[in-house]
Amino acid sequence: MTNIDKILAYNREFVASKGYEKHLTDKFPDKKLAVLSCMDTRLSVLLQDALGLKNGDAKIIKNAGAVIPSPWDSAMRSLIVAVYELGVTEIMVVAHTTCGACHMSFGHFKEEMLKRGIPAAELERSDIDLNAWLEGFHDTEKSVRNTVSAIVNHPLIPSDVTVRGFIIESATGELTEVK
């Protein structure tokens, strides 16, 4: 049985036993907060617990590295939707210690992609710079500052939205603000 099959079996039981009832809320975040964070598995539960957030408090948006690599990427789109459709007035950017995105390199990805059967021609496409798109960052504080700046200076984010950046310690959950 695959992991997805196990999840589907669990889900049937979850619904049948009404496990969802304790999670019922509406689509509007109670704290008018959005959090852009890394998709790292260590933060799956730790992030909300360390921030004191419960289901329904905030919109949580996750990607590799908690970054805004382009003003028109899906994370930025989600933040814009959160502001205009869901009433968000504050945004937290939360990166974390020992982030794998610090060490990402296109060279590594390219090698792995070729091993897994991706044609070399796909990696040479001229419509996207895969080297830039898959390159990580090397300074977490600088990355947080760049992400905060990208949000604050986005032409569709109003000036009355507060945006602040943080680094969470991956093991303890301790937050440090990045100024």
Question: What would you call each of these model-derived segments?
Answer:
Residues 48-53:
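Short Gly/aromatic-enriched secondary-structure transition segments
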Residues 36-38, 62, 94-96, 166-169:
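Short beta-strand segments
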Residues 40-42, 97-101:
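Gly/Ser/Thr-rich loops at beta-strand to alpha-helix junctions
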Residues 1-31, 66-76, 83-86, 101-179:
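Divalent-metal-activated hydrolytic enzyme cores
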Residues 32-35, 58-59, 89-92, 164-165:
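Structural motif
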Residues 84-96:
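Ordered, amphipathic secondary-structure segments that act as subunit-interaction surfaces
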Residues 59-67:
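A short, structured active-site edge motif that brings together acidic residues
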Residues 28-42:
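N-terminal low-complexity or amphipathic/hydrophobic leaders
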